Amino acid sequence: MTNIRKSHPLLKIVNNAFIDLPAPSNISSWWNFGSLLGICLIMQIMTGLFLAMHYTSDTTTAFSSVAHICRDVNYGWIIRYLHANGASMFFICLYIHVGRGLYYGSYAFLETWNIGIILLFTVMATAFMGYVLPWGQMSFWGATVITNLLSAIPYVGTTLVEWIWGGFSVDKATLTRFFAFHFILPFVIAALAGVHLLFLHETGSNNPTGISSDMDKIPFHPYYTIKDILGALLLILTLLLLVLFSPDLLGDPDNYTPANPLNTPPHIKPEWYFLFAYAILRSIPNKLGGVLALVLSILILALIPLLHTSKQRSMMFRPISQCLFWTLVADLLTLTWIGGQPVEPPFIMIGQVASILYFSLILILMPVAGIIENHILKW
């Protein structure tokens, strides 16, 4: 008799995705982050649901409703901080996941890669709208500045911004619709993640060597389920350390001041995970140019499969490309630092150099390195 997990219509899907799935025998801990992202998403949806039970999306009561959650709701403080810091953990896992894909050439799976880019944009949009909801100073001014960027679009820009605002400034209508979108988008993300996984399982996972591992596959369970549980425990431990010992470490003190349209904070900046893109935006002294650079800083990922010039898929045996990859990582960390600094010398120049280097590395230096490494192979 066939095992029920292989015959039952629902269990069969779970079995083929998480139990009997053939996986390469040599995938390292860098492959843990997909499952960690799934855990982050489930955790964010659960904590978000409980927060939504007590939150009110009205400009007069939003700030006090968040204070009420922290003070009066049973364990409201931990739910709120798990949700806020859970977003940070989500982005750490997300950036490592993308970095892994870049390093090991996982972008050769085109459908999986492109759905991943759509997922990245959706998660960024969700996080941005979530940051607006507590209705503190940085929430309000962040929403004002970022939505205003759309006014740089020729002809339709101003109309588009007012349409998003639901009025002539960021106000009650904006907050209500941002709450609605912030609630629905995680479910869109979950659906997209399902499609992401569907396309991945069409080809099977990549591995550190970038060579086909069809002749050496092992079942996902128990090998990688155990490995994923270890990763999950480390993720939860890190998150709990953050939430219980320093919940406001990654937040902005300005967001503990209620939103005031008449008082602009001295430094408007987004959460830390958007600072690299914000630094690229600010490094161009033209509004439309800055907005284009901001969008392209993420959209450039879609070009990476086209820019792959090497005969080898992975960077595992390509030292020049490895150096450039880690230079890119250092450059992104530099941009993150610059994004949090005021717009004054020497930070302006550092930001401009780092932005140029970011695009140069991806568009020029890495493809050239691939060609050079191909020639080295002939020696």
Curated annotation (Swiss-Prot):
The keyword Mitochondrion applies. Heme b b566 binds at residues 97, 196. The keyword Membrane applies. Heme b b562 binds at residues 83, 182. Its main location: mitochondrion. Keywords: Electron transport, Heme, Iron, Membrane, Metal-binding, Mitochondrion, Mitochondrion inner membrane, Respiratory chain, Transmembrane, Transmembrane helix, Transport, Ubiquinone. Pfam families: Cytochrom_B_C (PF00032), Cytochrome_B (PF00033). The chain crosses the membrane at residues 33-53, 77-98, 113-133, 178-198, 226-246, 288-308, 320-340, 347-367. It comes from the Eukaryota. Gene3D superfamilies: Cytochrome Bc1 Complex, Chain C. A ubiquinone binds at residue 201. GO terms for molecular function: metal ion binding; ubiquinol-cytochrome-c reductase activity. InterPro entries: Cyt_b/b6_C, Cyt_b/b6_C_sf, Cyt_b/b6_N, Cytb/b6-like_sf, Cytochrome_b, Cytochrome_b_C_euk/bac, Cytochrome_b_N_euk/bac, Di-haem_cyt_TM. Its cofactor is heme b. It is found in: Mitochondrion inner membrane. Belongs to the cytochrome b family. Component of the ubiquinol-cytochrome c reductase complex (complex III or cytochrome b-c1 complex) that is part of the mitochondrial respiratory chain. The b-c1 complex mediates electron transfer from ubiquinol to cytochrome c. Contributes to the generation of a proton gradient across the mitochondrial membrane that is then used for ATP synthesis. Heme 1 (or BL or b562) is low-potential and absorbs at about 562 nm, and heme 2 (or BH or b566) is high-potential and absorbs at about 566 nm. The cytochrome bc1 complex contains 11 subunits: 3 respiratory subunits (MT-CYB, CYC1 and UQCRFS1), 2 core proteins (UQCRC1 and UQCRC2) and 6 low-molecular weight proteins (UQCRH/QCR6, UQCRB/QCR7, UQCRQ/QCR8, UQCR10/QCR9, UQCR11/QCR10 and a cleavage product of UQCRFS1). This cytochrome bc1 complex then forms a dimer. This is Cytochrome b. It comes from Lama glama.
